[in-house]
Design a protein with these regions (language model features):
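Local cysteine-cluster metal-coordination motifs and their immediate loop/turn environment
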Residues: 20-35
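Short, amphipathic alpha-helical interaction segments positioned at domain boundaries
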Residues: 367-387
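C-terminal scaffold of the Radical SAM
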Residues: 2-16, 35-60, 64-337, 386-387
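A short, conserved structural fragment
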Residues: 348-359
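Short basic/hydrophobic patches in alpha-helices and adjacent helix-turn junctions
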Residues: 325-329, 345, 352
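Minor-groove-contacting beta-hairpin "wing" of winged helix-turn-helix DNA-binding domains
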Residues: 360-366
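Short amphipathic alpha-helical interaction segments
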Residues: 336-350
Protein backbone atom coordinates (compact mmCIF):
# COMPACT_ATOMS: atom_id res chain seq x y z
CA UNK A 1 0.00 0.00 0.00
CA UNK A 2 1.07 3.57 -0.61
CA UNK A 3 1.54 6.06 2.29
CA UNK A 4 -1.97 7.31 1.58
CA UNK A 5 -3.44 3.82 1.63
CA UNK A 6 -4.02 3.70 -2.13
CA UNK A 7 -3.58 0.48 -4.07
CA UNK A 8 -0.34 0.85 -6.11
CA UNK A 9 -2.03 -0.94 -8.99
CA UNK A 10 -4.41 1.98 -9.46
CA UNK A 11 -2.06 4.88 -8.76
CA UNK A 12 -2.26 7.53 -11.48
CA UNK A 13 0.40 7.50 -14.16
CA UNK A 14 1.44 11.12 -14.45
CA UNK A 15 2.77 12.53 -17.72
CA UNK A 16 3.23 16.10 -16.45
CA UNK A 17 5.36 17.34 -13.55
CA UNK A 18 5.52 20.74 -11.89
CA UNK A 19 8.33 21.62 -9.47
CA UNK A 20 8.07 24.78 -7.38
CA UNK A 21 11.43 26.48 -6.85
CA UNK A 22 10.75 29.17 -4.22
CA UNK A 23 13.93 31.24 -4.27
CA UNK A 24 13.89 34.93 -5.22
CA UNK A 25 16.33 37.83 -4.98
CA UNK A 26 13.54 40.02 -3.58
CA UNK A 27 9.75 40.06 -3.39
CA UNK A 28 7.98 41.93 -6.18
CA UNK A 29 5.50 44.58 -5.06
CA UNK A 30 2.47 42.64 -6.34
CA UNK A 31 3.56 39.08 -5.48
CA UNK A 32 1.79 36.85 -2.95
CA UNK A 33 3.34 33.57 -4.12
CA UNK A 34 5.14 31.22 -1.76
CA UNK A 35 8.75 32.38 -2.08
CA UNK A 36 11.95 32.37 -0.05
CA UNK A 37 14.14 35.45 -0.45
CA UNK A 38 17.76 34.31 -0.34
CA UNK A 39 21.03 36.05 -1.19
CA UNK A 40 22.71 32.65 -1.38
CA UNK A 41 20.50 29.89 -2.78
CA UNK A 42 20.89 26.50 -1.04
CA UNK A 43 20.70 24.57 -4.30
CA UNK A 44 22.41 21.42 -3.03
CA UNK A 45 19.99 20.93 -0.15
CA UNK A 46 17.07 21.85 -2.40
CA UNK A 47 18.02 19.21 -4.99
CA UNK A 48 18.44 16.65 -2.20
CA UNK A 49 15.01 17.53 -0.80
CA UNK A 50 13.43 17.16 -4.25
CA UNK A 51 14.88 13.66 -4.47
CA UNK A 52 13.65 12.81 -0.98
CA UNK A 53 10.13 14.02 -1.73
CA UNK A 54 10.12 11.84 -4.84
CA UNK A 55 11.21 8.86 -2.74
CA UNK A 56 8.69 9.45 0.05
CA UNK A 57 5.81 9.91 -2.36
CA UNK A 58 6.83 6.96 -4.56
CA UNK A 59 6.90 9.16 -7.61
CA UNK A 60 8.61 6.49 -9.72
CA UNK A 61 5.63 4.16 -9.35
CA UNK A 62 3.15 6.92 -10.19
CA UNK A 63 4.84 8.32 -13.28
CA UNK A 64 4.62 7.33 -16.90
CA UNK A 65 7.10 8.71 -19.42
CA UNK A 66 6.78 12.44 -18.77
CA UNK A 67 5.65 14.71 -21.61
CA UNK A 68 6.29 17.98 -19.79
CA UNK A 69 8.43 19.18 -16.88
CA UNK A 70 7.99 22.71 -15.57
CA UNK A 71 10.24 24.46 -13.06
CA UNK A 72 8.24 27.41 -11.75
CA UNK A 73 8.54 29.74 -8.82
CA UNK A 74 9.69 31.82 -7.28
CA UNK A 75 12.62 32.26 -9.63
CA UNK A 76 14.06 28.89 -10.71
CA UNK A 77 16.88 30.62 -12.61
CA UNK A 78 18.21 31.68 -9.19
CA UNK A 79 19.43 28.09 -8.83
CA UNK A 80 22.20 28.93 -11.29
CA UNK A 81 23.78 26.53 -13.73
CA UNK A 82 24.88 23.98 -11.12
CA UNK A 83 21.61 24.14 -9.22
CA UNK A 84 19.43 23.59 -12.29
CA UNK A 85 21.60 20.66 -13.33
CA UNK A 86 21.50 19.11 -9.84
CA UNK A 87 17.74 19.58 -9.56
CA UNK A 88 17.01 17.99 -12.93
CA UNK A 89 19.37 15.12 -12.08
CA UNK A 90 17.46 14.64 -8.81
CA UNK A 91 14.24 14.35 -10.78
CA UNK A 92 15.79 12.01 -13.35
CA UNK A 93 16.84 9.64 -10.59
CA UNK A 94 13.13 8.97 -10.02
CA UNK A 95 11.32 9.71 -13.30
CA UNK A 96 12.03 9.63 -17.00
CA UNK A 97 10.84 11.97 -19.68
CA UNK A 98 10.42 11.57 -23.40
CA UNK A 99 13.13 12.72 -25.81
CA UNK A 100 10.72 15.34 -27.12
CA UNK A 101 9.42 16.40 -23.69
CA UNK A 102 8.91 20.11 -23.08
CA UNK A 103 11.22 21.10 -20.20
CA UNK A 104 10.56 24.69 -19.13
CA UNK A 105 12.55 26.87 -16.75
CA UNK A 106 11.14 30.15 -15.47
CA UNK A 107 13.91 32.75 -15.56
CA UNK A 108 14.37 36.42 -14.76
CA UNK A 109 16.43 38.60 -17.11
CA UNK A 110 19.14 39.34 -14.55
CA UNK A 111 19.99 35.62 -14.32
CA UNK A 112 20.21 35.04 -18.08
CA UNK A 113 23.57 35.00 -19.84
CA UNK A 114 24.85 33.03 -22.81
CA UNK A 115 26.89 30.78 -20.49
CA UNK A 116 23.91 30.19 -18.20
CA UNK A 117 21.64 29.31 -21.12
CA UNK A 118 24.19 26.88 -22.55
CA UNK A 119 24.48 25.19 -19.14
CA UNK A 120 20.69 24.98 -18.74
CA UNK A 121 20.34 23.55 -22.24
CA UNK A 122 23.01 20.94 -21.57
CA UNK A 123 21.19 20.04 -18.33
CA UNK A 124 18.01 19.34 -20.32
CA UNK A 125 16.08 22.63 -20.42
CA UNK A 126 14.63 23.35 -23.86
CA UNK A 127 12.23 26.20 -23.15
CA UNK A 128 12.43 29.40 -21.08
CA UNK A 129 9.64 31.48 -19.59
CA UNK A 130 11.17 34.92 -19.10
CA UNK A 131 9.63 37.34 -16.59
CA UNK A 132 9.97 40.68 -18.39
CA UNK A 133 6.74 42.28 -17.02
CA UNK A 134 7.45 45.71 -18.60
CA UNK A 135 9.90 47.58 -20.82
CA UNK A 136 9.49 50.76 -18.77
CA UNK A 137 12.25 51.24 -16.18
CA UNK A 138 10.05 53.33 -13.88
CA UNK A 139 7.37 50.64 -13.89
CA UNK A 140 9.96 47.92 -13.26
CA UNK A 141 11.31 49.87 -10.29
CA UNK A 142 7.77 50.30 -8.93
CA UNK A 143 7.26 46.54 -9.31
CA UNK A 144 10.45 45.93 -7.28
CA UNK A 145 11.95 44.04 -10.20
CA UNK A 146 15.72 43.61 -10.20
CA UNK A 147 16.23 44.02 -13.96
CA UNK A 148 15.73 46.98 -16.29
CA UNK A 149 14.41 47.14 -19.85
CA UNK A 150 17.83 46.92 -21.47
CA UNK A 151 18.70 43.75 -19.56
CA UNK A 152 15.41 42.19 -20.68
CA UNK A 153 16.42 42.73 -24.30
CA UNK A 154 19.89 41.33 -23.61
CA UNK A 155 18.33 38.28 -21.95
CA UNK A 156 16.36 37.45 -25.08
CA UNK A 157 19.51 37.78 -27.19
CA UNK A 158 21.39 35.54 -24.74
CA UNK A 159 18.64 32.90 -24.87
CA UNK A 160 18.98 32.67 -28.64
CA UNK A 161 22.78 32.74 -28.62
CA UNK A 162 22.84 30.04 -25.94
CA UNK A 163 20.71 27.74 -28.05
CA UNK A 164 17.27 27.89 -26.43
CA UNK A 165 15.13 29.36 -29.19
CA UNK A 166 11.83 28.36 -27.59
CA UNK A 167 10.92 31.02 -25.07
CA UNK A 168 7.92 32.85 -23.68
CA UNK A 169 7.85 36.45 -22.48
CA UNK A 170 5.58 37.61 -19.62
CA UNK A 171 4.07 41.09 -19.40
CA UNK A 172 1.80 42.59 -16.74
CA UNK A 173 -0.84 45.10 -17.83
CA UNK A 174 -3.25 47.48 -16.07
CA UNK A 175 -0.67 49.12 -13.83
CA UNK A 176 -1.77 52.22 -11.87
CA UNK A 177 -2.66 55.34 -13.85
CA UNK A 178 -0.12 57.53 -12.08
CA UNK A 179 2.76 55.54 -13.58
CA UNK A 180 1.78 56.91 -17.02
CA UNK A 181 2.97 53.71 -18.65
CA UNK A 182 2.90 53.50 -22.46
CA UNK A 183 1.31 50.08 -22.95
CA UNK A 184 1.47 50.36 -26.72
CA UNK A 185 5.25 50.86 -26.51
CA UNK A 186 5.57 47.73 -24.39
CA UNK A 187 3.61 45.74 -26.96
CA UNK A 188 5.73 47.04 -29.84
CA UNK A 189 8.92 46.15 -27.99
CA UNK A 190 7.57 42.71 -27.15
CA UNK A 191 6.66 41.97 -30.77
CA UNK A 192 10.04 43.25 -31.99
CA UNK A 193 11.79 40.63 -29.84
CA UNK A 194 9.89 37.91 -31.75
CA UNK A 195 9.18 35.38 -28.99
CA UNK A 196 7.26 32.26 -29.95
CA UNK A 197 4.98 32.59 -26.92
CA UNK A 198 3.58 35.43 -24.79
CA UNK A 199 1.75 35.43 -21.44
CA UNK A 200 -0.14 38.54 -20.30
CA UNK A 201 -1.48 39.04 -16.79
CA UNK A 202 -3.65 41.82 -15.45
CA UNK A 203 -2.30 43.36 -12.26
CA UNK A 204 -4.29 42.36 -9.19
CA UNK A 205 -4.09 43.78 -5.67
CA UNK A 206 -3.40 41.04 -3.12
CA UNK A 207 -3.71 42.00 0.58
CA UNK A 208 -0.43 40.60 1.95
CA UNK A 209 1.84 42.37 -0.53
CA UNK A 210 3.52 45.79 -0.70
CA UNK A 211 0.95 46.78 -3.32
CA UNK A 212 -1.87 45.57 -1.09
CA UNK A 213 -0.59 47.69 1.78
CA UNK A 214 -0.17 50.75 -0.46
CA UNK A 215 -3.72 50.26 -1.67
CA UNK A 216 -5.10 49.87 1.87
CA UNK A 217 -3.44 53.13 2.90
CA UNK A 218 -4.88 54.94 -0.10
CA UNK A 219 -1.44 55.46 -1.63
CA UNK A 220 -2.16 53.44 -4.76
CA UNK A 221 -5.24 52.86 -6.88
CA UNK A 222 -6.15 50.04 -9.22
CA UNK A 223 -6.41 50.77 -12.91
CA UNK A 224 -9.97 51.59 -14.00
CA UNK A 225 -11.90 48.67 -15.47
CA UNK A 226 -12.17 50.51 -18.78
CA UNK A 227 -8.38 50.73 -19.13
CA UNK A 228 -7.94 47.11 -18.08
CA UNK A 229 -10.24 46.07 -20.92
CA UNK A 230 -8.70 48.51 -23.39
CA UNK A 231 -5.17 47.25 -22.77
CA UNK A 232 -6.24 43.59 -22.95
CA UNK A 233 -8.07 44.09 -26.24
CA UNK A 234 -5.20 46.14 -27.67
CA UNK A 235 -2.80 43.31 -26.85
CA UNK A 236 -5.18 40.84 -28.48
CA UNK A 237 -5.40 42.93 -31.64
CA UNK A 238 -1.69 43.62 -31.97
CA UNK A 239 -0.45 40.13 -31.15
CA UNK A 240 -2.98 38.40 -33.41
CA UNK A 241 -2.01 40.88 -36.12
CA UNK A 242 1.63 39.90 -35.61
CA UNK A 243 0.85 36.23 -36.24
CA UNK A 244 0.14 34.94 -32.74
CA UNK A 245 -2.80 32.69 -31.88
CA UNK A 246 -4.69 33.92 -28.80
CA UNK A 247 -5.27 30.36 -27.66
CA UNK A 248 -6.06 30.90 -23.97
CA UNK A 249 -7.31 33.90 -22.07
CA UNK A 250 -3.81 34.94 -20.94
CA UNK A 251 -1.65 33.23 -23.56
CA UNK A 252 -0.58 33.74 -27.16
CA UNK A 253 1.55 31.47 -29.33
CA UNK A 254 3.07 31.19 -32.77
CA UNK A 255 1.57 28.29 -34.77
CA UNK A 256 2.57 25.00 -33.15
CA UNK A 257 4.09 26.72 -30.11
CA UNK A 258 1.38 26.46 -27.49
CA UNK A 259 2.70 25.80 -23.98
CA UNK A 260 2.26 22.05 -23.66
CA UNK A 261 2.56 21.95 -19.87
CA UNK A 262 -0.03 24.60 -19.12
CA UNK A 263 -2.28 23.17 -21.82
CA UNK A 264 -2.39 19.98 -19.76
CA UNK A 265 -3.80 22.00 -16.84
CA UNK A 266 -6.50 23.47 -19.05
CA UNK A 267 -7.47 20.03 -20.34
CA UNK A 268 -7.95 18.91 -16.73
CA UNK A 269 -5.50 16.01 -16.92
CA UNK A 270 -3.55 14.73 -13.88
CA UNK A 271 -0.22 16.33 -13.02
CA UNK A 272 2.32 15.84 -10.26
CA UNK A 273 3.27 18.79 -8.06
CA UNK A 274 6.55 18.78 -6.11
CA UNK A 275 8.24 21.37 -3.92
CA UNK A 276 6.97 23.87 -1.34
CA UNK A 277 3.38 25.04 -1.99
CA UNK A 278 3.11 22.93 -5.16
CA UNK A 279 -0.35 21.77 -6.17
CA UNK A 280 -1.08 18.47 -7.89
CA UNK A 281 -4.09 16.63 -9.29
CA UNK A 282 -4.60 12.88 -9.65
CA UNK A 283 -7.83 13.05 -11.63
CA UNK A 284 -10.10 12.94 -8.59
CA UNK A 285 -8.33 14.83 -5.79
CA UNK A 286 -6.36 18.06 -5.64
CA UNK A 287 -3.54 18.23 -3.10
CA UNK A 288 -1.10 20.92 -2.08
CA UNK A 289 2.19 20.90 -0.23
CA UNK A 290 3.34 22.83 2.84
CA UNK A 291 3.78 26.41 1.69
CA UNK A 292 6.89 27.60 3.54
CA UNK A 293 10.24 26.38 2.26
CA UNK A 294 11.51 25.63 5.78
CA UNK A 295 8.41 23.61 6.68
CA UNK A 296 8.53 21.64 3.44
CA UNK A 297 12.24 20.99 3.95
CA UNK A 298 11.70 19.71 7.51
CA UNK A 299 8.99 17.34 6.35
CA UNK A 300 10.94 15.77 3.49
CA UNK A 301 14.15 15.52 5.52
CA UNK A 302 12.12 13.55 8.09
CA UNK A 303 10.88 11.30 5.25
CA UNK A 304 7.32 12.59 5.60
CA UNK A 305 4.95 13.42 2.76
CA UNK A 306 4.90 17.26 2.80
CA UNK A 307 1.19 17.40 1.99
CA UNK A 308 -0.61 20.32 3.64
CA UNK A 309 -4.13 19.57 2.42
CA UNK A 310 -6.24 17.85 -0.18
CA UNK A 311 -9.73 18.10 -1.58
CA UNK A 312 -11.75 15.58 -3.53
CA UNK A 313 -13.75 16.97 -6.42
CA UNK A 314 -17.51 16.76 -5.95
CA UNK A 315 -19.81 16.48 -8.98
CA UNK A 316 -20.55 20.21 -8.60
CA UNK A 317 -16.80 20.99 -8.49
CA UNK A 318 -16.24 18.93 -11.62
CA UNK A 319 -18.99 20.72 -13.49
CA UNK A 320 -17.67 24.14 -12.51
CA UNK A 321 -14.10 23.23 -13.48
CA UNK A 322 -15.16 21.70 -16.78
CA UNK A 323 -17.05 24.84 -17.75
CA UNK A 324 -14.37 27.27 -16.61
CA UNK A 325 -11.45 25.40 -18.18
CA UNK A 326 -13.35 24.84 -21.41
CA UNK A 327 -14.19 28.51 -21.80
CA UNK A 328 -10.57 29.58 -21.14
CA UNK A 329 -9.25 28.28 -24.47
CA UNK A 330 -10.02 28.59 -28.17
CA UNK A 331 -10.78 24.87 -28.19
CA UNK A 332 -13.97 25.86 -26.42
CA UNK A 333 -16.52 24.01 -24.32
CA UNK A 334 -18.67 21.19 -25.67
CA UNK A 335 -22.31 22.17 -25.14
CA UNK A 336 -25.58 20.29 -25.46
CA UNK A 337 -28.50 21.21 -27.69
CA UNK A 338 -30.54 22.62 -24.82
CA UNK A 339 -27.69 25.01 -23.98
CA UNK A 340 -27.47 26.68 -27.39
CA UNK A 341 -30.44 28.92 -26.64
CA UNK A 342 -28.91 29.80 -23.27
CA UNK A 343 -25.73 31.07 -24.90
CA UNK A 344 -27.40 32.77 -27.87
CA UNK A 345 -27.43 36.03 -25.91
CA UNK A 346 -23.65 35.73 -25.54
CA UNK A 347 -23.33 35.45 -29.31
CA UNK A 348 -25.52 38.50 -29.89
CA UNK A 349 -23.39 40.48 -27.43
CA UNK A 350 -20.19 39.41 -29.21
CA UNK A 351 -18.92 37.43 -26.21
CA UNK A 352 -18.91 33.96 -27.76
CA UNK A 353 -19.40 31.91 -30.87
CA UNK A 354 -21.05 28.52 -31.28
CA UNK A 355 -19.11 26.37 -33.74
CA UNK A 356 -19.11 22.80 -35.01
CA UNK A 357 -15.83 20.90 -34.62
CA UNK A 358 -15.13 17.17 -34.74
CA UNK A 359 -18.85 16.47 -34.78
CA UNK A 360 -19.42 18.43 -31.57
CA UNK A 361 -21.09 21.73 -30.82
CA UNK A 362 -18.69 24.00 -28.98
CA UNK A 363 -18.90 27.42 -27.38
CA UNK A 364 -15.76 29.51 -27.89
CA UNK A 365 -15.31 32.84 -26.12
CA UNK A 366 -14.19 35.91 -28.03
CA UNK A 367 -11.59 38.26 -26.56
CA UNK A 368 -14.49 40.43 -25.34
CA UNK A 369 -16.05 37.34 -23.78
CA UNK A 370 -12.84 36.48 -21.96
CA UNK A 371 -13.10 39.83 -20.22
CA UNK A 372 -16.30 38.44 -18.67
CA UNK A 373 -15.08 34.87 -18.21
CA UNK A 374 -15.98 34.51 -14.52
CA UNK A 375 -19.54 35.72 -15.02
CA UNK A 376 -20.12 33.64 -18.15
CA UNK A 377 -18.72 30.50 -16.53
CA UNK A 378 -20.85 31.03 -13.42
CA UNK A 379 -23.96 31.48 -15.57
CA UNK A 380 -23.44 28.28 -17.53
CA UNK A 381 -22.40 26.32 -14.43
CA UNK A 382 -25.61 27.36 -12.69
CA UNK A 383 -27.58 26.22 -15.73
CA UNK A 384 -25.87 22.82 -15.67
CA UNK A 385 -26.13 22.38 -11.90
CA UNK A 386 -29.46 23.84 -10.79
CA UNK A 387 -29.80 24.00 -7.01
Amino acid sequence: MSPTGADPAVLPKYEHLYLHVPFCARRCSYCDFAIAVRREVPWRSFADCVSRECETRRVREQSALLRTVYLGGGTPSRLGAEGVRATLEALRSHVQWANDAEVTLEANPEDISVDAVIAWREAGVNRLSIGVQSFDDDVLSWMHRVHDAASAVRAVEAARMGGIAAFSLDLIFATPERLARDWEHDLRQLIALAPDHVSLYGLTVEPQTPLGRWHARGEEAEAPEERYEREFLSAHSQLVGAGFEHYEVSNFARPGRRARHNSAYWRGVPYLGLGPSAHGFDGATRRWNIEAFAGWQRAVEADRDPVDGQEGLTPANRTAEMVYLGLRTVDGLVIEAEETERVSAWERAGWGEVIQRDGQTRLVCTAEGWMRLDALAADLTAFRSPS
